[in-house]
């Protein structure tokens, strides 16, 4: 099954999960799993949240992300991947000067 993100409508989510500014995402949801192409402008973030019934895989396409997962800070750049296991808590912020773009998968477990 093909998901054509270039023609998928973008959703703007202000203060997503208690984060700063807004998260823009093109999303596919089949009732159980989410596949997203997202972007954060400089200074924007996805707030701290726990993956109680899912994990999350985030692959950076461009920009620099500051991620904290279970209290451990990480800095990610394009081509790197962040994994948040089921039961873990994380947050992500664009602390750079360029737009942050990423591909994310949230499979229910």
Question: Language-model segments: which ranges?
Answer:
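A short, N-terminal "cap"/entry segment at the start of jelly-roll beta-barrel domains
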Residues: 1-34, 47
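Short strand-connecting beta-turns/loops that link adjacent beta-strands
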Residues: 33, 53, 97-98
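Conserved short histidine dyad/triad with adjacent acidic residue
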Residues: 36-51
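Histidine-centered metal-chelating micro-motifs
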Residues: 45-46, 66, 82, 86-91
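Glycine- and acidic-residue-biased ligand/ion/polar-headgroup-sensing regions
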Residues: 53-65
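Structural motif
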Residues: 64-66, 73, 89, 99
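Short acidic-glycine-tyrosine-enriched beta hairpin
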Residues: 72-86
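Ligand-binding loop in jelly-roll beta-barrel domains
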Residues: 86-109
């Amino acid at each position: 099954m093909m998901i054509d993100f270039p023609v998928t409508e973008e959703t703007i989510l202000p203060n997503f999960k208690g984060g700063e500014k807004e998260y823009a995402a093109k999303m596919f949801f089949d009732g159980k799993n989410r596949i997203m192409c997202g972007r954060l402008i400089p200074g924007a973030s996805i707030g701290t949240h726990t993956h109680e019934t899912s994990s999350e895989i985030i692959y950076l396409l461009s920009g620099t992300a500051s991620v904290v997962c279970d209290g451990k800070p990480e800095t990610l750049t394009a081509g790197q991947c962040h994994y948040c296991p089921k039961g873990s808590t994380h947050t992500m912020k664009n602390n750079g000067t360029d737009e942050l773009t990423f591909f994310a998968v949230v499979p229910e477990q």
